[in-house]
A protein has these predicted regions:
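Short, polar/acidic, helix-capping and beta-turn segments at strand->helix junctions
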Residues: 1-109
């Protein structure tokens, strides 16, 4: 069980965090990489890090993206085994988004 202050990140996507421009249209692997970069940055800004992710929810618009998305996520979560839920949904908020990832982490005591 994780102990500490909770950090809840809303669903993150492959967007430039400053311009809101969608990046890597049509490429689920690169969208996942950018999404994980955003998550890493936001967790660090909150005082946490990927090592303290305790829950992750992954939304995919196509089940065929699952393997490459999870392989890319695994590069960012080496040695971390959070509770995980994966969902296939008909669409995300913007048609160019192929994957959205939501995480909960802690700032350890």
């Amino acid at each position: 069980m994780a102990k500490g202050t909770n950090v809840f990140l809303r669903g993150q996507v492959s967007q430039d965090l400053e311009t809101r421009e969608t990046l890597y249209v049509g490429d689920p692997k690169l969208q996942t990489r950018k999404t994980m970069e955003n998550i890493d940055l936001l967790l660090k800004e909150a005082g946490s890090c990927m090592d303290h992710v305790c829950r992750i929810v992954v939304y995919l618009v196509d089940i065929r993206y699952r393997e490459e998305v999870y392989q890319e996520m695994g590069k960012w979560l080496k040695g971390v085994h959070p509770c995980s839920t994966g969902l296939v949904v008909p669409a995300l908020a913007r048609p160019d988004w192929l994957v959205e990832i939501e995480v909960t982490a802690v700032i350890p005591d």
